[in-house]
Amino acid sequence: MKKTLLIKANGIANARKSGVISGVGRSTQKLLSALDKIEDIPFDIKVYVDGTSGIGFDFYGWKFPHSVFPVPVSWGNEKTSLEPWYRKHFMKYNLLHIPHNDDWVYKGEKFVVTMHDVFEYDVALAEGNQPVIRKWQTMAYDSVGIMTCSEYSKSEILKRFKIAEEKVSVVYWGTSTDVFYKNDEQETNEHLGRLGVKSPYFLSVSCAHPRKNIRILLKAYRMFKVLNEQQNCNKLILVWNNPPEDLMTEYAREIDDGSVVFLKSVSDKDLRALYCGATCTMFPTRSEGFGFPILESFACGTPIMTCRNTCLEEVGQDVALYVGEDNIDEMVRVMMQFEQGEYDMEKFERDSERIIDRFSWENTAREYINFYQKYL
């Protein structure tokens, strides 16, 4: 009889209202979609989600048996241990996978966890948030295995927790080429028209968290504007739901003249069009566990500027353009390189294809199968 893997896939149902799954939820959804396409998996897989958002959810038509624990998280996990208790005693499985950093488990459950990074744990330590600290420590010490998405993230996990190096495995995420690819020009223009965006422009898609470093990017863009005498130079488009008021006030002039544009959450189709139409994607982040925007931009045929830190060179390799996260002059030089037509797009197109081919969701799924088999 085959053994059974149970995956708690929280986050995959969030797109029903917004049309968007981001970050951890997106990686879980893409992993499961890739597993769904593999016929020779030597064990059974079951999937479930908790909370009311899963009620009526179709689980993307996956072949895996699926279920919903329809109790609000606050009651099922935070105020009681009802969900972990129910899972342990009534959901028949040999191994539980928690793919979203941390969760509640019942004593004696055999589980593996995917830790994407340690940002949330560091915040909890800084704030003295003991419930979150305990959850992370439970994940690190009580799991039978840990998966992460970059060598950098592995090194950070090992720094935070006293665990054996061999307990932590690394498998890179894939390029979502079913979502991000080169649009034809007409389709791109139709989407940009509906968004009110006109070319040429630089694009930044990951803005909300302070570590995304958008304040420095805006300072660099303002300097770029001062140095550039062309009226129709590249604008800066930022996908950002709720930019802070002080930033809106500080850059009111650029917002008023249309050179800086803030867009709220956009659909995947709109995001693809934004990538495809951009001159360059600007991703000046201070720290990442993986860095999806690099692969998304490459898949859409658009170069990316990012920073020489954390995992970013593992993903962007020798194809991304690297700057210091506080080096405004370097950022301006990259902007001017594109503005003056000095960037070699033909070389980029050849080299970026190599990156896209390497980061495959099928490869990711098969590596995860090996990981699961190790602990089943």
Language model: regions and residue ranges:
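Carbohydrate transferase catalytic cores enriched for Leloir-type hexosyltransferases
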Residues: 1-376
